[in-house]
A protein has these predicted regions:
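TRNA-binding/sensing appendages of the translation machinery
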Residues: 1-83, 138
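Positively charged, Gly/Ser-enriched RNA/tRNA-binding surfaces
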Residues: 17-35, 46-47, 82-153, 200-325
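Beta-rich nucleic-acid/ligand-interaction surfaces
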Residues: 42-60, 161-171, 265-273
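Residue-level detector of family-conserved "landmark" positions at structurally sensitive sites
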Residues: 42-43, 158-161, 180, 259-262
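Acidic, His- and aromatic-enriched active-site or binding-groove loops in soluble protein domains
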Residues: 62-70, 175-199, 203-204
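Cap/lid and interdomain-hinge subdomains that line or gate substrate/regulatory clefts
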Residues: 132, 136, 159, 189-190, ...
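Extended alpha-helical scaffolds
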Residues: 151-155, 163-166, 176-179
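Short, solvent-exposed helix-helix connector turns and helix-capping sites enriched
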Residues: 162, 191-192, 220
Length: 325
């Protein structure tokens, strides 16, 4: 093997692409700053236990690990910047009110994943801490959509979800709260209606019917919300989740060409606590932006704070904008 061949899913970035990426980074960071989001720059490497807290637990298999020759402790190369920004908010800034932060930098993953399907991802994003209201979710979603508009990414398709609906059903049916019965959880994610019906056959009729309904509750936002209110139990948790989705849909109308809701989208269930959103654009199979609510992410750092935010992949955006230049 030639010594200069790069590892799989790791690439050099050549001048034309590098210039597009840098222009995008500057435009987006200026856009964030103008809306009150302050820039932070976490380190590339941290103690592993710090990286794998909150959302970080789901990233353990994605994290490159090494031994620190100075301390002998296990270190990790960041696979996502969200846990690091949460640490900064909770442990270093310690602000009592709402905190708005943004970031941009490389993350490294053991397996190709994320929005660009590379192992090194040029991540940029924004986080809002200290506000548990729907208004905060609306602000972050609005910032994501306006950011894409600022870099001339058009023809957007928005998918909304909310883990609170499944969590309310699992609690009501007395299924384990850590993801529920794993077979049922997986069947819901794959929308396997016959298997969901089989696995819930012994539940009380109201809960059984609700789980079965969940496999069909995806599609245009207005249709899904109407069907969900008709077919799901009228509990405060479910009503609140649907109201949140309704408000987010109102925020996005006019900024996207298509607006869908999927109530069986359980991506990130183990750390998400509320609404999630994924943005797609015409001609791109993968999402170009993702966001979610993850309250309590700073608990491991001494302060459990409401949090919501989103991330984008600069290299993916550069590829999209490069098509039109």
């Amino acid at each position: 093997m030639r010594k200069w061949v790069l590892p799989e899913y790791i690439d050099d970035i050549l001048p034309a692409e590098a210039e597009r990426i840098e222009a995008l980074r500057r435009t987006l960071l200026d856009h964030f700053r103008d809306r009150g989001y302050r820039l932070v720059q976490p380190p590339l490497v941290e103690h592993l236990d710090s990286l794998l807290t909150g959302t970080g637990h789901d990233l353990e298999l994605q994290t490159f690990k090494l031994i620190d020759p100075l301390s002998g402790r296990l270190l990790g190369v960041r696979a996502d910047m969200t846990p690091q920004v949460a640490r900064i908010d909770a442990h270093l800034l310690k602000e009592s009110g709402v905190t708005r932060l943004c970031y941009a930098g490389s993350v490294l993953r053991t397996v190709a994943s994320g929005l660009s399907q590379m192992r090194e991802v040029l991540q940029i994003g924004a986080e809002l801490y200290g506000d548990a209201s729907v208004a905060a979710d609306q602000e972050v979603l609005g910032l994501l959509l306006s950011s894409l508009n600022a870099v001339a990414v058009r023809r957007l398709h928005l998918d909304l979800g909310h883990v609170g609906v499944y969590r309310a059903l699992a609690n009501g049916a007395h299924i384990s709260g850590d993801g529920g019965d794993s077979e049922l959880f997986d069947a819901l994610r794959s929308k396997d209606l016959p298997l969901v019906a089989e696995l819930t056959a012994r539940l009380p009729a109201a809960w059984r019917d609700a789980f079965v309904a969940l496999t069909t509750l995806y599609g245009p936002a207005a249709d899904v919300l109407a069907a969900a209110r008709a077919r799901l139990p009228d509990t405060p948790s479910i009503a609140g989740a649907l109201a949140t989705l309704d408000k987010l849909a109102q925020t996005a109308r006019g900024a996207v060409e298509a607006l869908h809701i999927d109530l069986a989208d359980l991506r990130g269930y183990h750390y998400q606590t509320g609404a999630s959103f994924s943005v797609f654009t015409a001609g791109e199979a993968n999402a170009i932006g993702r966001g979610e609510r993850y309250d309590g992410i700073g608990k491991a750092f001494g302060r459990a704070r409401p949090a919501t935010g989103f991330t984008l992949d600069l290299r993916q955006l550069a590829g999209l904008t490069g098509r039109t230049t």
